[in-house]
């Protein structure tokens, strides 16, 4: 079943593999499956944490999207990635999918830096919210029932709003907003438009992160 789901979705499979390997490396260092961040160099060096965003620390805005806090966090996100990501990748194409996914990670990080600067954050869920928004556009393009993707987004947003302090509110909302902005052009019939959408979203996210973390704009805590 898993092989069939990931057929023609190499990027989805690769992202899931990278997330799993990062988790295993952090778990081995921390000697734990339930808290792999602060007792491992892998976790401590890749988690998004605003005060550490400087120089090489900028990579945290990307690497944090491949780090998960515990085994349950990893399993839930990889389950969503495999089934939602594979569907989106098969529709939009592998190249545009990769650009859009990375843009989703960065826009989620952007939102966290803007609204919750000093909150340590990790996980693929911001990018998954991006993909869920795109999934709605795919259903519309196919003229299929919109209820399933709308319910999926609605349930996840409700869970986010009802779970303060346990999930990244701003990461999720930032990823969802990015997906909403990309969804229509990313599902265009034009492959050139799909590539351009992912590329522009990625570049804009990078520029916004840079602007947010300039010395004159970094929040003082």
Predicted regions and their residues:
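C-terminal transmembrane module of polytopic alpha-helical membrane proteins
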Residues: 1-7, 162-221
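N-terminal TM1-TM2 helical hairpin plus the immediately adjacent luminal interfacial "cap"
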Residues: 8-122, 164-167
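Membrane-interface micro-motifs in multi-pass membrane enzymes
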Residues: 117-134, 168-171
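Alpha-helical transmembrane bundle and helix-membrane interface signal
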Residues: 90-91, 135-150, 187-199
């Amino acid at each position: 079943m898993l092989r069939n789901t990931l057929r023609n979705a190499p990027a989805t499979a690769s992202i899931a593999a990278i997330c799993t390997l990062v988790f295993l490396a952090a778990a081995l260092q921390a000697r734990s499956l339930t808290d792999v961040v602060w007792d491992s160099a892998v976790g401590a060096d890749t988690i998004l944490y605003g005060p550490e965003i400087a120089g090489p620390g900028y990579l945290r805005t990307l690497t944090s999207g491949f780090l998960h806090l515990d085994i349950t966090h990893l399993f839930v996100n990889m389950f969503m990635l495999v089934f939602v990501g594979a569907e989106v990748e098969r529709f939009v194409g592998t190249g545009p999918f990769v650009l859009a996914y990375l843009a989703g990670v960065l826009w989620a990080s952007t939102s966290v830096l803007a609204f919750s600067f000093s909150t340590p954050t990790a996980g693929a869920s911001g990018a998954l919210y991006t993909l869920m928004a795109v999934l709605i556009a795919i259903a519309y393009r196919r003229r299929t029932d919109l209820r399933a993707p709308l319910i999926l987004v609605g349930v996840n947003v409700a869970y986010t709003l009802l779970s303060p302090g346990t999930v990244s509110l701003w990461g999720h909302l930032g990823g969802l907003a990015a997906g909403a902005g990309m969804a229509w052009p990313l599902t265009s019939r034009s492959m050139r438009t799909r590539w351009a959408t992912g590329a522009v979203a990625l570049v804009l996210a990078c520029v916004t992160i840079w602007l947010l973390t300039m010395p004159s704009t970094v929040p003082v805590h």
